[in-house]
């Protein structure tokens, strides 16, 4: 007998499985697009290159680097990339929190406040030892001004002019502020001279160095914020506001601009409030350094001393007074 022409030359029941054949096909265009999108998002959050991610995924799936991905590999490949992306997103978020926190640590005594807080609350001494949730909590508390910030130690003020090192420090802060705001260095220095109250040709006194540095750093920090408020202004100050200062600045803001602590401030309002804080502190410092005329509260012998002085200027009266005193003493005895 001869086989029927056109019939497959294979045993009955051993025909090729269509599903098995499809799984051995290369990745479809849709599948490759899904994987490429995941890889694009992944490399945007990491320092890896596209080829490196493809190779790492194949290694995880047990596929040789030079072997092509097949359709049957797609579910495992998608899951692998999704997991990698989740880890990268979490790491990126943690880096952002740590970056914001590190920036705030350079403001005022925030570093000391954070160090005290994490030691008391978490029993740790370094930010690297905290969990992501703990880092977020510390950042939130610091941004909202809810950490107890110790007052910086005050150095005695002096009328001497700025030292070269102090002038260079201010100049560096001016340069940073100019880069952040687009304002010219010359205009910023002019504002500082006007704030300091020095006349043309005079030098800024060293006693205003700390206040000017605080003013410059606060302006730079707030210029990077899209919605500054009184709360963020307070947090931006290197030398934090004392309770009476905070009350005064709130009253000034309410009276001048009718704004509340949560109101978003304009650039002009931010600068005016910082100027107001600067002038208040300089004025308060001047009052504290003003010499006081100290006199005794009670001088019981003052009248007697004045009387003796008057009598000593007139010997005759002094002699008569002495006789009267002796006579009275004789009568009493």
Curated annotation (Swiss-Prot):
InterPro entries tied to this protein: Flagellar_regulator_Flk
Residues in the Periplasmic compartment per record: 333
Keyword Lipoprotein: no
Positions of transmembrane segments: 312-332
Membrane disposition: Single-pass membrane protein
Keywords: Cell inner membrane, Cell membrane, Membrane, Transmembrane, Transmembrane helix
Residue numbers on the Cytoplasmic membrane side: 1-311
Disulfide bonds: none
Subcellular location as annotated: Cell inner membrane
GO cellular component, one term: plasma membrane
UniProt-listed GO biological process terms: regulation of gene expression
Region feature (Disordered): 1-27
Role summary: Acts as a regulator of flagellar gene expression by modulating the protein level of the anti sigma factor FlgM upon sensing ring completion or hook elongation. Flk could inhibit FlgM secretion by acting as a braking system for the flagellar-associated type III secretion (T3S) system. Plays a role in hindering to flip the flagellar T3S specificity switch from the rod and hook-type substrates to filament-type substrates prior to hook-basal body (HBB) completion possibly by preventing interaction of FliK with FlhB.
Family per similarity comment: Belongs to the flk family.
Name of the molecule in the record: Flagellar regulator flk
Source organism: Salmonella typhimurium (strain LT2 / SGSC1412 / ATCC 700720)
Lineage: Bacteria, Pseudomonadati, Pseudomonadota, Gammaproteobacteria, Enterobacterales
Gene it is expressed from: flk
């Amino acid at each position: 007998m001869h086989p029927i022409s056109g019939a497959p030359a294979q045993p009955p029941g051993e025909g090729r499985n269509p599903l098995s054949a499809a799984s051995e096909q290369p990745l479809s265009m849709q599948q490759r697009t899904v994987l490429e999108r995941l890889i694009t998002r992944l490399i945007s959050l990491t320092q890896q290159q596209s080829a490196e991610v493809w190779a790492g995924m194949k290694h995880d799936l047990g596929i040789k680097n030079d072997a092509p991905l097949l359709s049957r590999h797609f579910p495992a490949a998608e899951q692998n990339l999704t997991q990698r992306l989740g880890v990268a997103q979490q790491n990126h978020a943690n880096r952002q929190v740590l970056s914001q926190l590190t920036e705030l640590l350079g403001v005022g005594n925030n570093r000391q406040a954070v160090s005290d807080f994490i030691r008391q609350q978490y029993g740790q001494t370094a930010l690297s030892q905290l969990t992501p949730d703990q880092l977020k909590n510390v950042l939130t508390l610091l941004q909202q001004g809810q950490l107890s910030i110790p007052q910086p130690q005050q150095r005695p003020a002096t009328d001497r002019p700025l030292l070269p090192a102090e002038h260079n420090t201010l100049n560096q802060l001016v340069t940073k502020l100019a880069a952040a705001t687009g304002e010219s260095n010359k205009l910023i220095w002019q504002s500082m001279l006007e704030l300091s109250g020095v006349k043309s040709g005079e030098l800024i006194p060293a006693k205003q160095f700390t206040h000017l540095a605080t003013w410059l750093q606060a302006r730079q920090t707030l210029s990077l914020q899209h919605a500054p408020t009184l709360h963020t202004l307070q947090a931006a100050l290197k030398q934090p506001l004392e309770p009476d200062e905070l009350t005064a600045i709130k009253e000034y803001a309410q009276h001048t601009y009718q704004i509340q602590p949560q109101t978003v401030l304009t650039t002009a309002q931010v600068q005016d409030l910082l100027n107001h804080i600067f002038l208040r502190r300089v004025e308060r410092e001047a009052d504290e350094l003003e010499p006081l005329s100290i006199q005794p509260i009670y001088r019981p012998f003052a009248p007697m001393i004045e009387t003796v002085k008057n009598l000593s200027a007139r010997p005759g009266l002094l002699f008569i007074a002495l006789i009267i005193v002796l006579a009275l003493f004789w009568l009493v005895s």
